[in-house]
């Protein structure tokens, strides 16, 4: 079983597109897209991780 992860190395970005591809974070919040999720990961200093793809 491989851990689910996304590459957030190119973040944070000031603006996220309106693309809707939900991801569920380890904080049990649904993020609208990889961009929104990665910005939150950066803000959390890496403590936030990806729980799974799709809504929580």
Curated annotation (Swiss-Prot):
Q: Which residues are glycosylated?
A: 45
Name assigned to this protein: Ovomucoid
Every Kazal-like domain range: 6-56
Name a GO CC annotation attached to this entry: extracellular region
Q: Name one GO molecular function term.
A: serine-type endopeptidase inhibitor activity
> Which InterPro entries does UniProt cross-reference here?
Bifunctional_prot_inhibitor, Kazal_dom, Kazal_dom_sf, Prot_inh_Kazal-m
Q: Which cysteines are joined by disulfide bonds?
A: 8-38, 16-35, 24-56
Species per Swiss-Prot/TrEMBL record: Callipepla squamata pallida (Blue scaled quail)
